[in-house]
Structure formats: structure tokens, C-alpha cells
Amino acid sequence: MKRILLLLVAIVFITLNISAVDADSVVVKKRSSMAYNGYQGGMMFNVGYVQSREFQFQDNNGLPLGQSHRLSGASMGLGGALRVGFGKYFRVGIEGYVSTLKYQPQGSSAKIGWGGLLLDSHWHIKKFTIFTGGVIGGGSYTHITMIDKGESFSENDYVVENQYVSYRHYPFLAVVPFVGMEYSLTQRISVVAKIDYMLNVTNWADDYAAGPRFFVGFMFGR
């Protein structure tokens, strides 16, 4: 996934350089409806409420460990996006984020990292810009649970390593619809806020925690 993101970043920057050269050296009387129309990039903080289905654990011998579990709570993280405008309403780019849910027992966490190709449409209303779109790309889910040594045994399907720690890590294809709004502070700086919901298309296990996330941050562009 890192190689794909690096390739996308390279493609976007090459596009920016070519477009900048064309804009500076070529005079056109009428712009194309899909002509290069600037770019923006920045960082955003995310917070959301996520929850999983019920799941259970087992030890390395296949014996059940503990009772049923369900993840739920606030997840938080950071990330960023880079978008290039084409025409009046269309933008394409890349984004990548990390979001982590921490829970008890201490040391337990469920972390999602994802990134991919971004497409959106936007509409300007004075200093405000409303946008909607989606991201398609790759995600990875890492779930670490510290097992309470005093738990009783029951039927399950999640393997516990080293007797008291469960570690699960798996990739998936992510589709992430979103809607949001920007407010222009200056010609080059905007405050941005959006809401999304990540769909795990290929590997939605019982311990996968999903829910809406709210993002807020700053975008810089020209």
C-alpha cells in the first residue's frame, strides 16, 4: 500500500508541475471545461464513534477463552489529503489516515490505517465550498487485546497468542463515501470539515469496528 501511495503522490506532483508550466507559458482565450484548476493539501484530525459485532477468543490449543466481546467507543487519529482541481466542479487526489480505538484492559487497541484515490465534486457559495465524494483504496486493521487472566472459558473463534494476548492484523479493500464543507480564511488557506463512513468491502470480520468519523483541519493551496 505504501508503494501505491508513493506512486500516486509522484503522479500528482508531476501533474502539478506540467500544469504549472502550461499555465505560465500558454495563453488560451477559452479554458477547457476540465482544465487544471489549482490544488490544495493539508492535515486533518479525526474522531469518531465505532463498534464491532460480538466476537470471542480461543487459546492456541483451541480452548475457548472468556466471554463474548464487542468493541465500542471513540476512535481518534491524524492524516491528510492532496487534491487537484479540474474544471469548475471536479477534484482528484489521494488521502491517507490512521484512526485508533483504545479500550480496557490497558494496552488493548483497534487501529485502522487506510489510503487511496480520492474523487469529489464541489460547489462554491461565497467563502464556503460544499463537497461530496469518495475514496477507494487499501486499508489494514490491527487489533490487539490484552486478555484478563481471570476470565472464564466459553465457545469462540479468535486465537489468543502467548496465552494472554490476542493479535490480529488483516488487509481489506476500503470504499469511503464522505460529505464536507470548507471555509476560505484567505485565498490560499481554508478550514475544512467532513464526515465519512468506511466500508470494509472484502474482509469484514466480527471484530472489525466501524462507524462515522468527523474530520477537521486546514488546507493550503493555490
Language-model features, listed with the residues they occupy:
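Sequence/structural signature of outer-membrane beta-barrel proteins
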Residues: G48-E54, P64, Y97-P105, G139-H143, ...
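Residues that define the transmembrane beta-barrel architecture of outer-membrane proteins
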Residues: N37-Y39, S72-L78, S109-G115, H169-V175, ...
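Short glycine/proline- and aromatic-enriched beta-strand/turn motifs that initiate or cap beta-hairpins
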Residues: A20-G85, G221
